Design a protein with these regions (language model features):
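Polar, enzyme-active/binding microenvironments
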Residues: 1-189
């Protein structure tokens, strides 16, 4: 774990179990990481208090290559696995329960927002599609100008950014704004 103070990175507490291809959300002093590889981690959660990690509740569906959004006590995991799955789960700080199913099963997507107002973008098959969550169900939204997988996203359901991608590697960034026009490319490299 590394923590950023606005200008430099410093070491934080180590995870109890190393993992890759999972999802995370929260803040520097209240973080959450869930799922990933190797296989014993595919349904586990760890919570960060700013100095150390402790075990949280286990997910109902083991996943990797999933996306996350929300806070440590109100998180959302979306999709994941190969081939992609359409299920989501919601975390209340103690346990995970089933959420609404995505319109499109996907993995390697990125999420932003909170548990009751989330955005999921890109993923499986180099998709450019986005979906919005209202805490109950998902609806299709605007397409990005570039299909993305293995990329990052940040922000809220109403205002988010998607940055970088793999295959081909790109440093492009797109800005999502709920409304019209919904997607705007702000940099392409």
């Amino acid at each position: 774990t590394e923590e950023y103070n606005g200008s430099t990175w410093t070491a934080g507490g180590n995870l109890a179990s190393g993992r890759g291809y999972g999802a995370a959300c929260g803040t520097q002093t209240a973080g959450l990481i869930f799922c990933g590889n190797p296989s014993p981690n595919r349904n586990t959660t760890e919570e960060y208090d700013g100095s150390s990690w402790t075990a949280g509740g286990n997910l109902g569906t083991p996943r990797e290559f999933n996306a996350g959004a929300g806070t440590q006590t109100a998180a959302l995991t979306m999709g994941g696995n190969i081939p992609g799955i359409a299920t989501t789960e919601e975390y209340n700080g103690t346990s995970w329960t089933a959420g609404g199913n995505l319109g499109t099963a996907r993995y390697t997507a990125a999420g932003a927002g909170i548990q009751t107002a989330a955005l999921l973008a890109g993923g499986t098959g180099d998709t450019d599609g986005t979906e919005l969550y209202d805490g109950t169900s998902w609806t299709t939204s605007a397409n990005m100008s570039l299909a993305r997988k293995y990329f990052g996203a940040a922000g809220s359901q109403a205002e988010a950014i998607a940055f970088a991608t793999q295959s081909p590697v790109s440093g492009s960034t797109e800005e999502f704004t709920l409304g019209s026009p919904a997607i705007r490319t702000i940099t392409t490299t």
